A protein has these predicted regions:
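Hinge/lid segment of periplasmic solute-binding proteins
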Residues: 125-180, 192-198, 307-312, 331
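Loop/turn elements at helix/coil->beta-strand transitions in domains of secreted/extracellular proteins
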Residues: 82-85, 114-118, 168-169, 207-212, ...
Length: 339
């Protein structure tokens, strides 16, 4: 358990690791930094008596697969904080080839029995909405507002507002990106709404044979995108029900019908063209992308000669078809004694 040794396993060079004759472990680590010089170190781990280790208050952190960046931050916290220590319990270790969700089942079983972790980490695996509805999670707004260093007026509130549920912040993203679609300004720039009808109208203005996304997208993939961006139209998160017997959903099915059920790779003899090239050549209407930094923006503007519009995915209610995404979010349980 590298975290228990205050070592970030992400930095360990796998071919520079071994055991000394006296049982000690030696490893070479490399830490990359954008701002400071990168560091390479030799670590030697000695076995010590547990009684000699400084006692700290333990905070249990539950996850299904620990995020790469979060792992590094946990190690830094454990090494620097004199009073508290985060103990990671990764429930993905319970998953099997036959039951991929065994870890989630194990976690839920422990929560039901009253063994609730202090911190919950979620990528997309945990039912955070259900946990919040059952009163298991703290509203994080009061903690942010009371913090002199990280109050909400010092943070970008748009991603936090998007993560709210009925005005309460049950999960805090450790980072964020924007999932959207990009099109040429000269093609989609005039639209003030972006519904399925608008997409079909814009597509009709391109040369015959043009596609909405890359030609490799199938019906199932397109339907998944459209449902994800219109989930609120089909699902009631409060009572846990959903309804797909609507004109709106039937319109989605009609929209994805022209896409192939499966792409025929064997019959495709065309040379590969990037999404940006297809956009500029009028062969493709939109390119779905995720923007996680200014470098992504810069590359997109440069690739399309600054003639771009981040118009997003079609939504029938006329609202923005863009969405925030995060590598993971953090939640605090209401049973945590050390908030």
């Amino acid at each position: 358990d590298w975290i228990a040794c205050d070592v970030d396993s992400n930095s360990i060079n796998s071919d520079r690791f071994g055991f000394l004759s006296d049982g000690r472990i030696v490893a070479v680590t490399y830490e990359y930094s954008d701002n400071d010089p990168s560091k390479q170190q030799v670590l030697v781990l000695n076995r010590v008596d547990a009684a000699a280790v400084t006692t700290k208050t333990e905070l249990t952190l539950a996850c299904l697969y620990l995020d790469y960046n979060l792992r590094s931050q946990i190690v830094k916290f454990n090494k620097s904080n004199p009073d508290y220590r985060i103990v990671v319990k990764d429930y993905s270790e319970y998953a099997t080839d036959d039951d991929y969700n065994a870890g989630l089942t194990k976690l839920n079983t422990e929560i039901i029995s009253g063994n609730v972790p202090d911190i919950l980490v979620n990528g997309t695996e945990l039912p955070i909405g259900q946990y919040a509805a059952k009163g298991l999670l703290e509203d994080l707004w009061p903690y942010l507002d009371a913090d002199p260093e990280y109050s909400r007026d010092k943070l970008m509130t748009q991603p936090l507002n998007a993560a709210q549920t009925d005005g309460k912040l049950y999960r805090l993203p450790i980072d964020f990106g924007v999932t959207t679609t990009v099109g040429l300004g000269k093609v989609v720039g005039e639209y003030t709404t972006w519904t399925l009808a608008d997409v079909n109208d814009a597509l009709s203005r391109l040369p015959e044979g043009a596609t909405v996304f890359n030609k490799y997208y199938t019906q199932a993939e397109m339907l998944q995108y459209c449902i994800a961006m219109n989930a609120g139209s089909f699902m009631n998160w409060q009572d846990g029900t959903c309804s797909f017997d609507t004109d709106e959903f039937r319109a989605l099915l009609e929209f994805v019908k022209p896409f192939p059920a499966e792409y025929d790779w064997q019959s495709d003899s065309d040379d590969y063209e990037s999404d940006y090239t297809r956009l500029k050549n009028g062969k493709q209407l939109l390119y779905p992308t995720s923007l996680s930094g200014f470098s992504d923006l810069y590359y997109t503007f440069a690739a399309l000669n600054n003639d771009i519009r981040f118009i997003g995915f079609p939504r029938e209610d006329g609202s923005s078809g863009n969405a925030f995404n995060a590598s993971c979010t953090l939640s605090i349980s209401t049973t945590c004694k050390d908030k």
